[in-house]
Amino acid sequence: MEFDTIAAISTFPGEAGIGIVRISGDEALEIISKIFRPFRKKDIKSVKSHTIHYGHIVDPETGEVYDEVLVTVMRKPNTYTREDVVEINCHGGIVVSSKILELVLKHGARLAEPGEFTKRAFLNGRIDLSQAEAVIDIITSKTMLANRYAQKQLAGVLGQKMKDLKNKIMELLSHLLALIDFPEEDVEELEREEIKRRAKDILNDIEYLIASSESGRIIREGLKTAIIGKPNVGKSSLLNALLKQNRAIVTDIPGTTRDVIEEYMNIKGIPIKLIDTAGIRHTDELVEKIGVEKSKEVLAEADLILFVLDASRDLTKEDYEIFDILSGKNIIFVLNKVDLPKKIDEEELKKLVGNGIIVEVSTVERTGLDKLESEIYNLVFKGKVSATEEEIITNARHREVLINAKKHMESVIEAIEKGYSEDLITIDVNGALNEIGKITGETATEDVINQIFERFCVGK
């Protein structure tokens, strides 16, 4: 596949020790030969692949030296894009790297679009679409566990899984086509039973992957953990204590928190998205009322609720009203302010909590926080919210595709059981095959491909 030559700054803009300008395409070596002056006189166009060269970037028209640089030459096909690639390592900072990029563009390159280097790697067959998505996940990973899964996907683990699944579906299709082409009444019933067995086997594989996607979402995006409670029970103090920094404003005035505050923390490799919410209560104050409504929206989407109660006060009607709207949620009851004289009725608390998890903490004295973190982690790994090393589906797009493939395979099994013709059954088998191809990119539409690469930054 032929493309023009593209270039972009691949490092984060701003003051830094090093900046990198990346060039990819057939004209990469020609362009660098015009603007690079190596200290050891050599023809940069004829140097060996994967070598580094020291010299100056110079404007050939004015003779002005832009910077002292290291130039890396990588020849196709053993490069990130499977094209000739040149990387200019210059001093960091917006001015130097921008001026070098301008010079590169002036001498024949085009400014790369977001994700275009990785898109070329995909279009040139170096990686599949799931591996391209893994690049984004590596860049945005919030913990080493999330990075580990993304690295597995980049290494092709998911692609191989899809290849194995695709082969199973193709074998099923070949059985069906054989029945269509060579119908024999005495063996047809046996063949249909074998086809049904294979279809169920494929369906089981797909269902296993779908089941893993909830754990994968948590590892990729974080466990959405809402800190809920009535005003002035210490929700913002709990957020600050868990983060070990003063992120939220804390006062003795009820209703201080008006908006939702989101921050990430890491518990043994699991990214935890902590969401501090406005205290839930009846109020006529407009801004606080909006905050309460936002709290209820967060509550509906949360994976886990930290329901904060005040140990220094009795349970109130507001506590019970909040508990009533938490039905069906994973809840840890956080009994805060245990450093103060305890006034909460223990029997009443037990009736409210039942068999639920209670953790006593003091955000003032920083006690009980390790216990709370352990309970959050245990909840993740006890199956209520699962996340195990074997799971590999971390992407919402992949989950949606697999759900569609599952529907096709369920239709295949139903059609076999109802005695439909092989011609009709093959329609859904081909449908499942088409869906699986969307994960690796073989059957993904151009719009889907473009949407994926638009999420990248320029230079990647």
From Swiss-Prot:
Q: Give residues annotated as binding Mg(2+).
A: S236, T257
According to the entry, every stretch annotated as the TrmE-type G domain falls at 222-381
Q: Which GO terms describe its cellular component?
A: cytosol
Where can this protein be found? Cytoplasm
Give UniProt keywords alphabetically: Cytoplasm, GTP-binding, Hydrolase, Magnesium, Metal-binding, Nucleotide-binding, Potassium, tRNA processing
Chain sites annotated for binding K(+): N232, T251, I253, T256
The yes or no answer to whether the keyword Magnesium is present is: yes
Instruction: Give the binding site residues for (6S)-5-formyl-5,6,7,8-tetrahydrofolate.
Output: R22, E87, R126, K460
- How does this chain assemble? Homodimer. Heterotetramer of two MnmE and two MnmG subunits.
Describe its function. Answer: Exhibits a very high intrinsic GTPase hydrolysis rate. Involved in the addition of a carboxymethylaminomethyl (cmnm) group at the wobble position (U34) of certain tRNAs, forming tRNA-cmnm(5)s(2)U34.
Matching entries from PANTHER family are given as:
TRNA MODIFICATION GTPASE GTPBP3, TRNA MODIFICATION GTPASE GTPBP3, MITOCHONDRIAL
Name used for this protein in its record: tRNA modification GTPase MnmE
Q: Which gene encodes it?
A: mnmE
